[in-house]
Amino acid sequence: MKNSIVVLFLLISLSACSQNSEYNVSSYQTEGTKAPNTHYIGEAWLNAIIHDDTELGYNITKATFKANSTLDWHTHSTAQVLIIVDGEAYYQERGKDPLILKVGDVIKCEKDTEHWHSSTKQSDVTYLALYGSGKPTAWTEVLTQEYYDEIAKMFLHD
């Protein structure tokens, strides 16, 4: 009798697992993989939550940058929306003043608009980036540590 009950529980568990395998579930809470230091200085992790989904037509990526990390100037071939879920970020579009984004802030960057965004000098940042399935990011100019430090000093005086 005990063996029958054990077998029954195992079958129910296997059945539940097979039912769950019918779904493609990902989590934005997963840190992701450490990004190679190609277009930034510091430490960053990326989690491609939804990537190249042709039915949806957009991607969702979670990015986490440690404090005092930079991200180079770049453009996207589609609009991009950033949703700040933890920490604080610097954000700047070419020709405009930089600003600080905080938890709960949502900002849209129009397609082909040159911009950069990253953690602040004192705070890590985690954000969700929503963007279309267009061409890859076009990296346009290195954001120097000196320029980043100038931005940080500017906000210390505010």
What is the role of each PLM region?
Residues 76-90, 94-95:
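Glycine- and acidic-residue-biased ligand/ion/polar-headgroup-sensing regions
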Residues 73, 91-92, 114-120:
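Short beta-strand His + acidic residue motifs that chelate non-heme Fe in jelly-roll/DSBH
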Residues 95-112:
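Short acidic-glycine-tyrosine-enriched beta hairpin
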Residues 17-57, 138-158:
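A short, N-terminal "cap"/entry segment at the start of jelly-roll beta-barrel domains
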Residues 4-14:
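Sec-dependent N-terminal signal peptides
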Residues 122-141:
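A short hydrophobic beta-strand segment most commonly corresponding to one strand
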Residues 59-76:
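Conserved short histidine dyad/triad with adjacent acidic residue
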